[in-house]
Amino acid sequence: MKRRNADCSKLRRPLKRNRITEGIHSSTFLYLKFLVVWALVLLADFVLEFRFEYLWPFWLFIRSVYDSFRYQGLAFSVFFVCVAFTSDIICLLFIPKQWLFFAASTYVWVQYVWHTERGVCLPTVSLWILFVYIEAAIRFKDLKHFHVDLCRPFAAHCIGYPVVTLGFGFKSYVSYKMRLRKQKEVQKENEFYMQLLQQALPPEQQMLQRQERETEEATSKGMSEADSVLVAQNGTAINKKLPISLPELEYKEKGKDSAKDKKQQQHSIGINNNILQTVDAKLQDIEYMENHLNAKRLNNELGGSAENLFLKEEVGAGGGSAPSKHYKNSSPRSHNSTNGSVPSSSSNRSDKKQKCTGKNLAPHRDLMENCIPNNQLSKPDALVRLEQDIKKLKADLQASRQVEQDLRSQISSLSSAERSMRSELGQLRQENELLQNKLHNAVQAKQKDKQTIVQLEKRLKAEQEARAAVEKQLAEEKKRKKMEEATAARAVALAAASRGECTDSLKSRIRELESECKKLTHDMKLKEEQIRELELKAQELHKYKENEKDTEVLMSALSAMQDKTQHLENSLSAETRIKLDLFSALGDAKRQLEIAQGQILQKEQEIKELKQKIAEVMAVMPSITYSAETNNMTPVTPHYSSKFMDTSPSSLDPNASVYQPLKK
């Protein structure tokens, strides 16, 4: 039995293991596995002439598409596929094939080693250098045609898919930074508005909130310090136990975070509502709030003095535990009673006073007698102020209504002016279109006239040249004719003198010359007619030139009309701007009217409440009795409005990160 127990204890004792040797063995085995996988893939590539390492990014792409379809929907998955496809096509078209294969293979192997648990260390860097050297020295030059054509799309995908993932990662990083920036801005705004709200609270509530915060911070610090001490003392044992309790802790932390988020949302909504109300209200609202706060302070002071009297009496009568109870009863919540609870509260206090001794009754009576007149004096002042505020608001309302009527009349006049201007603008546009059509026709006619003028000028020049040539020929013919006539006369004279044999030949010659002269005269007449026609055409051309001057006048008139239309358009745009400004002013006036009406209703309600309270106080005044036998006073406590005292502790969180409004 002893031996058996000894053996069991020996077996139960944990064996010490050297972690350094385990790390070395595991790392060497891992890198040997990488080398074996790499060698097998290279062998398969060499034997089958296909690069199987390109299928790994394709498999990753299919997994990412499936995950996007499962978690983000069909639209995002289709968009992701389209983006990856376009990036693959760009890499396929614009990257040379050798560099494409080199970059794809090196990226695949480097990424495969990068995904290990070791990270960047000496073995991984050495493997990367080996892969890059083999790819650059051996495989960069050995490319076959069938191998290239089949594997090129997969190589393009090996580069295009990482580019797409990097782009999405960069986009998510930028959106995360922008979200953090927005959260910081919203946190600053929330802190600012939280400080405003804390400053607006009464000092008692501020002190209570500070104490609550200090206690919460102390508890949180104590919990964190206790956790750190436990971790430091226990070491690995606690670390081993932590994963077991992590789900419960996460569940509790999630519940706390959700509750805090809800509270922060409610506080942020309340803060924003208060902010909108304070921004929309103007100087009159500020004055009203000051008066309201002054009245509240007066009521608090009066109520505090009366309660302090009762507390002092009860402290004098009771023991050390009584003040705390009465202090709790004298909290502002005790004053939030209705009219039906007045007799019960007065009877309770009278019973307590009957139990107490008769010490210090005279000063208490004096103080209570001074309390009610002060309250009576403060409330009519508030009524007077409220009536003055109502008168001011009514005057402002009438002024805003008059302004609204003036604005509406101006809007109607401007709308009528706009209609007339639009009609005039339409007429001017029609006239402008007609003038543009006339101008277009005139320009076309002018171009045609210019073409005809150029042709006629060419004809005129040709005719003038022909006329000059004909005139030269006529002059030469006349000279020749004169010479011939002279020679003929001489010859005739000589022939007549010598012999009369050449008369027939001379007669025939004379006939020929006469016929030629007739032809020349006929040609001269034709040329003169042509010259007259050309002169008529030249006159027509002069008329066309005069018409060009008329077209220039029309152009100047058209430009003037265009300037006028542009001026009218500018004036119309200015009037539309004025109308928009007037509409915005009308909207502001309506908002001010609504705000003023709401304030008037609120103040009327407050006046009614104050009148009711004054009537109640006046009715309660004769109820104060003095008994000579018991020397006890049974006053009725003054009524204070529970509306002006909100003692609910604020649980706003100034460290709110993001404002999230409620969705309706």
UniProtKB/Swiss-Prot annotation:
Biased composition (Polar residues): 644-658
Gene (UniProt): Maco1a
One annotated GO molecular function: microtubule binding
Keyword Chaperone: no
Organism, scientific name: Danio rerio
The name this protein goes by in its record: Macoilin-1
PANTHER family, A to Z: MACOILIN, MACOILIN-2 ISOFORM X1
Glycoprotein recorded as keyword: yes
Family affiliation: Belongs to the macoilin family.
Keyword terms of this UniProt record: Endoplasmic reticulum, Glycoprotein, Membrane, Nucleus, Transmembrane, Transmembrane helix
